[in-house]
């Protein structure tokens, strides 16, 4: 942030760097790049690696893994950590993109970073802090959750019933150590676990975004997110309970894009699976998030990076005409 645009471009071209710290005992960091850093968070559809989950592959993953060698894309996965106490450090290490590293890395994040790197021709760093099945509440602080009385925070670690759903535990364990890290923005893929609490999601997600921005003290940084893809949630609904229409959750997600500045939503209505909550088309998710970043954050012109948004309907005799905004 202290360098001019021309100075940054010069730094990017003269890569990689070696950085030496010396307080009497030298510490050398080698193979350092200067580029764009994005935080990638959410639940299993953000966490899902390029190699896929058991019996749940990622579309075209084999060929994309084989072609993934690119020292200008750097990958960091935050180790799963669930706790009621805010942490100051995380476990993990930076790795260059290669078949051996990409196969275990978030598919959505990788496809996002690959396109951003390709179009901008600058190094891209990706930090993934995600946990499958995690609730929105888990990525928030106790103060932010005061407005949501249904979010119950345990008194002690032994009272934690769910390591990935309990309010505050993933914010404390996986996000708090990253606060203050200079980054360009966030991509987010979450909402499936909140599908049956859609009535609070728009307010809660808005609170999360504003809270993260307040903690980071880097202004209204870009925050782009995926709308949940189609899936038959009756499969995971308890016997005897009513199946809740997930259109309510998607509507809540759509509201956030219009109430919170510098956000954008990637629609995935054409990229889901009726019987699979982890759709294989992760390239669609990652690249739609990248299109948002490229057009809204980096100013790339000539393409429409935003997903179509419902505008209204008109009924003429026996015909219903549906109109959309941003349908280019």
Task: Please name every model-derived segment.
Residues 1-8, 12:
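Single conserved hydrophobic/aromatic residue that forms the stacking wall/gate
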Residues 14-24:
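Short, aromatic- and glycine-rich surface loops/edge beta-strands on solvent-exposed regions
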Residues 25-36:
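Edge beta-strands of extracellular beta-sandwich domains
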Residues 36-37, 70-72, 120-125, 181-185, ...:
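Loop/turn elements at helix/coil->beta-strand transitions in domains of secreted/extracellular proteins
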Residues 54-99, 120-170:
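Surface-exposed loop and adjacent secondary-structure segments within mature catalytic domains
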Residues 127, 228-269:
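Substrate-gating cap/lid alpha-helix
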Residues 165-177, 203-211, 243-255:
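Alpha-helical scaffolding within the catalytic cores
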Residues 249-328:
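Catalytic cores of secreted or luminal carbohydrate-active enzymes
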């Amino acid at each position: 942030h202290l360098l001019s645009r021309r100075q940054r471009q010069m730094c990017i071209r003269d890569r990689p760097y070696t950085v030496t710290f010396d307080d009497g005992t030298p510490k050398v960091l080698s193979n350092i790049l200067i580029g764009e850093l994005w935080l990638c968070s959410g639940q299993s559809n953000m966490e899902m690696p390029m190699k896929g989950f058991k019996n749940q592959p990622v579309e075209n993953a084999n060929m994309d893994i084989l072609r993934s060698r690119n020292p200008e894309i750097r990958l960091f996965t935050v180790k799963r950590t669930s706790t009621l106490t805010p942490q100051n450090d995380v476990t993990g290490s930076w790795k260059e993109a290669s078949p051996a590293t990409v196969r275990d890395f978030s598919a959505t994040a990788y496809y996002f970073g690959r396109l951003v790197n390709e179009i901008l021709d600058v190094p891209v760093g990706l930090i993934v802090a995600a946990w499958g099945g995690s609730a929105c509440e888990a990525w928030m602080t106790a103060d932010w959750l005061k407005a949501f009385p249904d979010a119950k925070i345990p008194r002690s670690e032994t009272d934690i019933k769910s390591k990935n759903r309990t309010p505050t535990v993933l914010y404390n364990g996986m996000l708090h150590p990253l606060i203050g890290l200079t980054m360009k923005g966030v991509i987010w893929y979450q909402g499936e676990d909140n599908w049956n609490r859609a009535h609070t999601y728009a307010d809660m997600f808005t609170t999360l975004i504003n809270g993260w921005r307040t903690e980071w003290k880097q202004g209204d940084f870009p925050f782009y997110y995926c709308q949940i893809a189609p899936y038959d949630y009756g499969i995971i609904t308890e016997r005897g309970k009513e199946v809740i229409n997930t259109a309510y959750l998607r509507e809540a997600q759509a509201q956030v894009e219009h109430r919170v500045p510098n956000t954008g939503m990637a629609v995935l209505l054409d990229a889901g699976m009726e019987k699979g909550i982890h759709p294989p088309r992760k390239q669609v998710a990652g690249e739609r998030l990248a299109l948002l970043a490229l057009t809204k954050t980096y100013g790339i012109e000539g393409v429409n990076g935003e997903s179509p948004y419902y505008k209204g309907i008109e009924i003429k005799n026996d015909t219903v005409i549906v109109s959309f905004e941003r349908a280019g």
